[in-house]
């Protein structure tokens, strides 16, 4: 499991421009991530997803996020997410640790 504090810094630097994590957070360019873990792709209420995201059909968890965050466009071809990905495994683990905590508390 990664480091939550390091993950928060990564989120602020690389994700917060397009995503929020708070329960009452608004959608931005990307969806609000509250309740992410255990939810299927393309299912955040009120966000307009591509058909690729809606039909991927996987459930978000540590393993699926770890793979997705390395190269989002390879994992879900046709996604609107224009982020290139995080290549360093430890950075992905830190970000996932932060997301797990921040999207459920």
Curated annotation (Swiss-Prot):
Its main location: mitochondrion. The modification N-acetylglycine is found at residue 2. The keyword Electron transport applies. Heme c binds at residues 15, 18-19, 81. GO terms for cellular component: mitochondrial intermembrane space. It comes from the Eukaryota. Belongs to the cytochrome c family. This is Cytochrome c, somatic. Pfam families: Cytochrom_C (PF00034). The lineage of its organism: Eukaryota, Metazoa, Chordata, Craniata, Vertebrata. InterPro entries: Cyt_c-like_dom, Cyt_c-like_dom_sf, Cyt_c_1A/1B. Binds 1 heme c group covalently per subunit. GO terms for molecular function: electron transfer activity; heme binding; metal ion binding. Keywords: Acetylation, Electron transport, Heme, Iron, Metal-binding, Mitochondrion, Respiratory chain, Transport. It is found in: Mitochondrion intermembrane space. Electron carrier protein. The oxidized form of the cytochrome c heme group can accept an electron from the heme group of the cytochrome c1 subunit of cytochrome reductase. Cytochrome c then transfers this electron to the cytochrome oxidase complex, the final protein carrier in the mitochondrial electron-transport chain.
């Amino acid at each position: 499991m990664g480091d939550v504090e390091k993950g928060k810094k990564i989120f602020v630097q690389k994700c917060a421009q397009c995503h929020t994590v708070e329960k009452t957070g608004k959608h931005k360019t990307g969806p609000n991530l509250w309740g992410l873990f255990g939810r299927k792709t393309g299912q955040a209420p009120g966000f307009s997803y591509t058909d690729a995201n809606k039909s991927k059909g996987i459930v978000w968890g540590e393993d699926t996020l770890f793979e997705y965050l390395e190269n989002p466009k390879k994992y879900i071809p046709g996604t609107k997410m224009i982020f290139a990905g995080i290549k360093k495994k430890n950075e992905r683990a830190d970000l996932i640790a932060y997301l797990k905590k921040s999207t459920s508390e």
